[in-house]
Regions:
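Alpha-helical scaffolding within the catalytic cores
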Residues: 47-62, 137-148, 168, 172
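C-terminal catalytic histidine-bearing segment of alpha/beta-hydrolase fold enzymes
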Residues: 155-157, 161-216
């Protein structure tokens, strides 16, 4: 079951967001939380756009069911996730206060612009998340030590034929992290795939099983 909402704050930017609760949701039970950051093409004020890709696409179009709480905020038009780091962290805080979230199992993922946003948000507060999965995002190599020192589990996907965000962005990010002794980061190469590595990542059971197995 998914629903559309607006998050408001007196001191932070406001977001529209989509929320998914598992079948037979029990408010007395703790659930993993998956936070999804969409790409540049899904910005604006139409939440249907924010469900074009990723796990919510398969909930909406195919009736797929997942064992986690899902929230997908929507980035305003012509803006970038990097503009909203503090607001996103406050948003996550509120979600954890209002829903029965297992705070040892908070996962962050995103695609393209949202993949870059995933890197940025994780670097701002690496201890917040049990694992991250940046999909075809631009790397931030010079801050690789932050994630390496936090030993944050990371699973990347990238198409080797991506001409929008080149494959080397993820490859270089992996090298930057591993250079500092991180041993729980990996990159899955989608051979022959362009920018749409998300179509492979979010239908890959390996990613979901790996993510849900991570706990702080």
């Amino acid at each position: 079951m998914y629903t559309k909402h607006k998050w408001s704050s007196d001191v932070h930017y406001n977001f529209n967001y989509v929320k998914y609760l598992p079948k037979d949701f029990d408010a007395n039970k703790k659930y993993p939380l998956v936070i999804f950051l969409h790409g540049a093409g899904e910005r604006g004020d139409d939440l249907d756009l924010a469900m074009r890709h990723g796990y919510m696409k398969y909930v909406r179009e195919g009736g797929k069911e997942y064992p986690f709480i899902f929230v997908g905020p929507q980035c305003p038009k012509d803006k970038y996730w990097g503009c909203y780091t503090e607001s996103l962290l406050a948003f996550i805080d509120d979600i954890c206060k209002t829903l029965p979230v297992d705070e040892k199992r908070i996962y962050l993922t995103g695609l393209s612009m949202g993949g870059t946003g995933t890197w940025m948000l994780a670097m701002a507060d690496p201890d917040r998340f049990a694992a991250i999965a940046p999909i075809c995002g631009s790397g931030i190599y010079w801050h690789g030590t932050v994630l390496a020192n936090a030993k944050l589990p990371i699973f990347m996907y990238h198409g080797d034929c991506d001409d929008t965000v080149p494959f080397y962005e993820s490859a270089n990010m992996l090298r930057a992290i591993n250079r500092h002794g991180h041993n729980n980061a990996k990159l899955k190469i989608c051979y022959g795939v362009g920018h749409n590595a998300w179509d492979y990542a979010y239908t890959d059971d390996e990613l979901l099983e790996w993510m849900l197995a991570q706990s702080k």
